[in-house]
Every structure is written in structure tokens, then in C-alpha cells.
Amino acid sequence: MKRERSNILNLRMDELKEALAAINEPQWRAAQLHQWLFSHRAGSFDDMTTLSLPLRRKLAESFYIQQPVTEKHDETMEGSPAGATEKLLIQLPDGERVETVLIPGPNRMTACVSAQAGCLLGCSFCATGQMGFRRNLSSGEITGQVWALSDMLQERNREASISNIVFMGMGEPLLNTANVIEAVLNLSTRKYRFSTSQRKITISTVGITPEIDRLADTGLKTKLAVSLHSAIQEKREALMPQAARQYPLDRLRESLIGYASKTGEPVTLAYMLLKGINDSEMDAKRLIRYASGFFCKINLIDYNPIVNIKFEPVCDGTRERFRDILQDAGLQVTIRKSYGTPINAACGQLAADCTGNSDNL
Ligand code: SF4
């Protein structure tokens, strides 16, 4: 029986080797083929002129090459001194949609990418969580988001390039770890046409502890950010029910201590300040206790409004008071500005227009 053809861009390097072995080709060809796909971005097997004609034919019998398509572009200048924040809605070959965001900053250009279509974890402040889980993205689909943003940037200015990548878009990266790591390799170590330093890539998680432990052992130089949002177990469970119950704060702290000591890198603890929920002096003191004793820094972030979700951001005074309490205790604290709120491109707002957020445009 003839096997159905599949999209070769969905395969990781290890899977590509297996696929070549299955058609009686040596595995070492995988690197060559991978380079055609992910550096030259060949649109057809006929373009792969360094591969023999019989091999190209065999590949075309088993696979096709289909890249994601940009369906919609939005941009806003609001609150962004370094240029417009831009959001792309990307349609994947099977019709699923994800969003990806380009955020200009002083001396940097950051791509914020999605790792999953939807999300299983349903955090109460997050639009993606309202969508439910659709599926994991392949490494090619993650890599393709950076290409799409990079192409958009370079069409306007050949000299411009993406310097930083953050896995802070839709979905939980560490529930799709193998494909996220493969995408990191595509975008850094392999030195392909698009390449940045691993140190400029941040993987952001709600705290999937076994995967944090695994990441610490990979030798990757990527940075780790953890969405903490409360250092009090009950409050965290109210905000992020699934993640907080499955990976309690004590266990999470063990993983973070292990990660920081193995990698020698600080962990960033992201703390979204929510009015009347986690913004009191007592909350700050619990955070100090939690964050003391291991190599970390704290990013205070604002809540960005989401349709059907009733949290409120704190005022400037509350944010500054909270920061001062942490700083007085010796913690390294940054107030991180959010960009892209008017186009629902800021933290927690990405939902591939499934929540009706597009009505606000
Ligand atoms: S915050 Fe992250 S983990 Fe939580 S629902 Fe949103 S995408 Fe999922």
C-alpha cells in the first residue's frame, strides 16, 4: 500500500535520519538535506541541486515541502519608542493558526514565538488558555515564525535583523520540549541563513519541573524565565490551577536551584502584578523568601487586558512600592514594559483571534 506523503519540514534532524534510513539512504545525508530545508529554505526537492536526481525523486515520493503562510498583519506604535510592535497571524498547513510578534527595543529586535496551537494549562489570566489545546507545533513551524518575522523586517530594511527570540507566545514550550530544542538549534548552533546566539534566546515556562531539569542537562546556553506570579501556593493555584497543582512551588524551587547551579545562569522569575490579588506587602515578602538563596532576577510585568477576563493592572505607585520592597531585600528587579497591547500582541493576549479580541482592533 502506498504511504501518504507528509510535510518534510515537520521532521527534526533525528527524524530526518530515520526517514532517510527508511528509503535506504545513508543517514549522513540528513545534514545536507536539512541545510537545504532550513538554511536555503528550498521550496521544492528540484531546487536541491547537490542531491542526486534519484534521491530527489525518492524524497518527492514520500514528502512534500509546505511552509506556513502569513494570513494577517497588525501593528501599533503605542507605548513603543523604538518602532512599531507587529503581530502576524500565521496559518499552518493543516489550517491551525498561531500568532507571532516582533518587538523592537533599544538595541534589540525581539521575535516572540509560539510553541503550541492553544494551550492545555488554562491559566486564568491568559487568552491562549481560553482556547484549549489544539496541538504541538513542529520544530519547522516554530522556526518558520522567526523566518516570517525576519522576512517582513528585511523587506523594509536589508540591514535589519532579529537579535533576540523569546518563547513567550502561545502555548507552554516545555510541554513541547523536543521541538523547541530543535528549533533553537535551527536558529542558533547550526549557523544557517538565519542565526542568532543561544544566549539571546529565552525559553519561558510556567514551571514544568521535569522539563526544567532536562533542559539544565542539555548544555544549551539559552535563558530560562519562569512565570511565577505568586510565591504563595494557594494563590498560585487560583491563578494557574493546572501548572501550580501539578508542579508545586517547593518542587519548582528545587528545579530552579538545580538549573541555576548547573548552568551558572540566573533564572528570571516573571511576576505579573494583579490589582488586589498578588500586589500586597505580604506578597512581596513571600516572594523575597522564595527568591532568596539562588541565582535569579525578577521581572515585574503589568497585566494586559483580555476580553472575558476580569483582572486589573496595578497603578504606578503600587508597582513601584512592590519593586522597592524587593530591591531593599537585595533582589535584582526590573519593571518590564509590555508592548503591543492595542493589537492584542502583549503578554497573555495571544489567541489567534479566537477570543474575539480582534473586535478591539
Ligand atoms: S500562560 Fe502560558 S501556560 Fe498558561 S495558559 Fe497561557 S500559554 Fe498556557
Curated annotation (Swiss-Prot):
One of its GO terms (cellular component) is cytoplasm. Its EC number is 2.1.1.192. It is found in: Cytoplasm. GO terms for biological process: rRNA base methylation; tRNA methylation. [4Fe-4S] cluster binds at residues 119, 123, 126. The active site is at 99 (proton acceptor), 347 (s-methylcysteine intermediate). Disulfide bonds join 112-347. S-adenosyl-L-methionine binds at residues 171-172, 204, 227-229, 304. Its main location: cytoplasm. Keywords: 4Fe-4S, Cytoplasm, Disulfide bond, Iron, Iron-sulfur, Metal-binding, Methyltransferase, rRNA processing, S-adenosyl-L-methionine, Transferase, tRNA processing. GO terms for molecular function: 4 iron, 4 sulfur cluster binding; metal ion binding; rRNA (adenine(2503)-C2-)-methyltransferase activity; rRNA binding; tRNA (adenine(37)-C2)-methyltransferase activity; tRNA binding. CDD domains: Radical_SAM (cd01335). Residues 105-342 form the Radical SAM core domain. Binds 1 [4Fe-4S] cluster. The cluster is coordinated with 3 cysteines and an exchangeable S-adenosyl-L-methionine. It comes from the Bacteria. InterPro entries: Aldolase_TIM (IPR013785), Methyltransferase_A (IPR040072), RlmN_N (IPR048641), RNA_MTrfase_RlmN (IPR027492), rRNA_lsu_MTrfase_RlmN/Cfr (IPR004383), rSAM (IPR007197). Its cofactor is [4Fe-4S] cluster. SUPFAM superfamilies: Radical SAM enzymes (SSF102114). It catalyses: adenosine(2503) in 23S rRNA + 2 reduced [2Fe-2S]-[ferredoxin] + 2 S-adenosyl-L-methionine = 2-methyladenosine(2503) in 23S rRNA + 5'-deoxyadenosine + L-methionine + 2 oxidized [2Fe-2S]-[ferredoxin] + S-adenosyl-L-homocysteine; adenosine(37) in tRNA + 2 reduced [2Fe-2S]-[ferredoxin] + 2 S-adenosyl-L-methionine = 2-methyladenosine(37) in tRNA + 5'-deoxyadenosine + L-methionine + 2 oxidized [2Fe-2S]-[ferredoxin] + S-adenosyl-L-homocysteine. NCBIfam families: rRNA_mod_RlmN. Reaction proceeds by a ping-pong mechanism involving intermediate methylation of a conserved cysteine residue. Specifically methylates position 2 of adenine 2503 in 23S rRNA and position 2 of adenine 37 in tRNAs. Belongs to the radical SAM superfamily. RlmN family. This is Probable dual-specificity RNA methyltransferase RlmN. It comes from Chlorobium luteolum (strain DSM 273 / BCRC 81028 / 2530).
